[in-house]
């Protein structure tokens, strides 16, 4: 499972994937435990 320490990495990963799907990834991608 993901913890608060994983959020900076995930945020950086999302910022590399700037696109129309970014918001959906933010909402659902990080919840994929």
Curated annotation (Swiss-Prot):
InterPro entries: GAST, Gastrin/cholecystokinin_CS
Modified residues (Phenylalanine amide): 33
Biological processes per GO annotation: G protein-coupled receptor signaling pathway; response to food
Keyword field: Amidation, Cleavage on pair of basic residues, Hormone, Pyrrolidone carboxylic acid, Secreted, Sulfation
Leader sequence residues: none
Major localisation: secreted
Domain of life, per lineage: Eukaryota
Modification Sulfotyrosine occurs at: 28
PTM annotation (Pyrrolidone carboxylic acid): residues: 1, 18
Gene Ontology cellular-component terms listed: extracellular space
Compartments, record wording: Secreted
UniProt keyword annotation of Thylakoid present: no
UniProt GO MF annotations: hormone activity
Assigned protein family: Belongs to the gastrin/cholecystokinin family.
PANTHER family for the chain: GASTRIN
Record function comment: Gastrin stimulates the stomach mucosa to produce and secrete hydrochloric acid and the pancreas to secrete its digestive enzymes. It also stimulates smooth muscle contraction and increases blood circulation and water secretion in the stomach and intestine.
Listed name of the protein: Gastrin
């Amino acid at each position: 499972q993901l913890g608060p320490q994983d959020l900076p990495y995930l945020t950086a990963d999302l910022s590399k994937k700037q696109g129309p799907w970014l918001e959906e990834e933010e909402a659902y991608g990080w919840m994929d435990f």
